[in-house]
């Protein structure tokens, strides 16, 4: 490995190690006793020391995820990639190690910028990371003794593995893979650059947002498939008659805003924004940034308010009459990111409108094509009645892996029914 890679740093990974085999291994247990270790996880620190000493003899420095300095004492100075929490860099400084800031909450660019309709397929095990959130990443230690040496943005290719929507289709020559990567990386990579070069006290989001706009023409000139920002709400006024007046702004110089006021998705031929717009219902406004006939943003969009159902967890699915069949059929919906780890979950089905009852059958949880949990049932639920809840347990969670649920649901008496489904982790 050292012959192939002449770099100063050698990365050994070291994150999310599983210690169950070590707990059962007599040799590992004997080693723990000989070294006086109390926790099996401390064996990782022992192994890190062995490799770090090997690297030192070869004139190299060990680098790995922050677990390498959290699982037992490491004697040689190493570099820890802090991906859990920005404050973890303090641990590196206090224990004689170096650190690189790369928290998943701000620097994992395989997450989408938003979770609005039409957003690109991307990682979902953490919330979206907007351009502003990326730019606002906190840096906790600017002291003279700080050993934080920089920032790192991570871009994982899991989504290429998990679905065929991103695979190249040669006859079309779409260059999907590069376009996909550029869409997620730009303009957020510009934010990463400033986080690395400018002290947090001198960062100014409004100033940065304005300056980024001047770079879109450069990206266009380079053929970069960057993500266009949606129109921005500058002002929202509530009028005496209950209507709402919006004032919008565009962050892309030379671009237009096109909008609709009926809740439908706008296109490049929709009404051009020239001044404040008044609507009876704020949720009916949709607006897009238009650069050309083929380059436009996702819509400015008001997400539904599910706060009244907070006790049931996160919204994962909704049905309307056209989706409901008179005979048994499976409703399939993604729960990647909503399923956040091993444990027990409850899936709650709540009809909200309609005269007809819904018949519910078996629920199945899938990890890719592998069945993880199955709950059999034969229940009927109707608007105004108690919701139906399925309980299941997951013990083979895998971060970054897609999960989906199939639920048998139908309405033999007619499809006049509308409802929602929520998922929560209970233990």
Label each residue range with its predicted role:
Residues 1-78, 83-96:
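Active-site neighborhood of glycoside hydrolase catalytic domains
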Residues 209-316:
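Short, compositionally stereotyped local motifs that mark structural "simplifiers"
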Residues 256-260, 361-366, 420-422:
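Beta-strand signatures of extracellular beta-sandwich domains
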Residues 348-355, 407-414:
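Short beta-strand-plus-loop segments that form exposed binding edges in beta-rich domains
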Residues 355-361, 415-420:
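Short coil-to-beta strand junction motifs in C2/discoidin
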């Amino acid at each position: 490995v050292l012959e192939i890679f002449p770099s100063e740093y050698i990365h050994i990974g070291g994150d999310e190690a599983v210690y169950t085999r070590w707990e059962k291994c007599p040799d590992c247990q004997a080693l723990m006793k000989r070294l006086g270790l109390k926790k099996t996880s401390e064996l990782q620190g022992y192994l890190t020391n062995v490799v770090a000493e090997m690297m030192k003899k070869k004139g190299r420095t060990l680098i790995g995820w922050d677990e390498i300095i959290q699982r037992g004492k490491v004697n040689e100075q190493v570099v820890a990639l802090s991906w859990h929490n920005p404050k973890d860099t303090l641990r590196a400084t206090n224990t004689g190690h170096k650190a690189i800031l790369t928290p998943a909450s701000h620097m994992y660019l395989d997450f989408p910028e938003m979770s609005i309709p039409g957003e690109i397929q991307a990682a979902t095990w953490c919330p979206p990371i907007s351009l502003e959130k990326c730019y606002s990443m906190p840096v906790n230690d600017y002291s003279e003794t700080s050993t934080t040496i920089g920032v790192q943005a991570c871009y994982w290719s899991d989504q290429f593995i998990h679905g065929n929507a991103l695979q190249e289709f040669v006859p079309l020559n779409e260059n999907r893979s590069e376009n996909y990567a550029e869409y997620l990386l730009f303009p957020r990579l510009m934010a990463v650059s400033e986080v690395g070069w400018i002290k947090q006290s001198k960062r100014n989001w409004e100033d940065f947002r304005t300056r980024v706009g001047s770079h879109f023409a450069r990206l266009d000139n380079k053929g970069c498939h960057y993500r266009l920002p949606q129109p921005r709400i500058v002002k929202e006024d509530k009028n005496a008659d209950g209507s709402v007046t919006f004032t919008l702004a565009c962050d892309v110089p030379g671009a237009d805003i096109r909008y609709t006021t009926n809740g439908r998705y706008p296109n490049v031929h929709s009404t051009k924004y020239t001044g404040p717009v008044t609507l009876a219902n704020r949720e009916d406004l949709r607006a897009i940034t238009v650069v050309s006939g083929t380059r436009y943003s996702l819509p400015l969009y008001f997400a539904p308010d599910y706060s009244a159902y907070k006790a049931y967890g996160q919204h994962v699915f909704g049905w309307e009459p056209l989706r409901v069949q008179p005979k048994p059929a499976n409703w399939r919906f993604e729960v990647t990111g909503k399923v956040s780890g091993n444990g027990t979950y409850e899936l709650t089905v709540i009809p909200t409108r309609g005269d007809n009852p819904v018949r519910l059958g078996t629920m199945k949880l899938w990890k890719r094509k592998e069945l993880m949990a199955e709950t059999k049932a034969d229940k009927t639920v109707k608007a105004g009645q108690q919701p139906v809840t399925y309980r299941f347990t997951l013990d083979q969670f895998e971060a970054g892996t897609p999960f989906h649920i199939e639920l048998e649901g139908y309405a033999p008496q007619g499809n006049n029914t509308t409802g929602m489904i929520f998922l929560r982790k209970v233990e």
